[in-house]
């Protein structure tokens, strides 16, 4: 009797949690409020760190700009969009943000694009 009560109670909890899940729609429809919009990023398997692609990102009706000296990848948005997720690319050019642009610093490292949900 106690076991069946626990199973029923567990099912009700799961049902209640699923019922409260909210679909936020597409990224374009989501209101990020004061936190800004997500930047496209690339990762590095050796350091397990991500860096933004470029330093300026369209956000709503304007643009969000990263702080100067932020490390970044000097990769065009079109190139980023065509990258295959989880494939390692060699010699991804590195730079630092300066006035909304990723300025090359003559260094490069291997990089990869995350899965689509990790944009």
From Swiss-Prot:
Pfam families assigned to the protein according to its UniProt record, in alphabetical order: EVA_Class_A
Disulfide bonds: 37-59, 55-97, 72-102, 92-111
Localization terms from the record: Secreted
Record-level Gene Ontology MF annotations: C-C chemokine binding
Predominant place of localization: secreted
Keywords: Disulfide bond, Glycoprotein, Secreted, Signal
Signal sequence region: 1-21
Carbohydrate-modified residues: 48, 67
Keyword Secreted: yes
Single GO cellular component term: extracellular region
Keyword Zinc: no
InterPro entries according to UniProt: EVA_Class_A
Function: Salivary chemokine-binding protein which binds to host chemokines CCL2, CCL3 and CCL8.
Protein name: Evasin P983
């Amino acid at each position: 009797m106690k076991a069946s009560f626990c199973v029923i109670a567990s099912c009700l909890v799961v049902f209640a949690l699923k019922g409260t899940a909210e679909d936020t729609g597409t990224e374009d429809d989501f209101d990020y409020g004061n936190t800004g919009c997500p930047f496209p990023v690339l990762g590095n398997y050796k350091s397990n760190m991500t860096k933004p692609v470029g330093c300026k990102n369209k956000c709503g009706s304007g643009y969000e700009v990263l702080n100067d000296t932020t490390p970044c990848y000097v990769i065009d948005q079109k190139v980023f969009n065509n990258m295959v997720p989880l494939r390692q690319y060699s010699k991804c050019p590195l730079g630092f943000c300066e006035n909304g642009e990723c300025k090359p610093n003559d260094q490069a490292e291997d990089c990869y694009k995350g899965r689509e949900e990790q944009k």
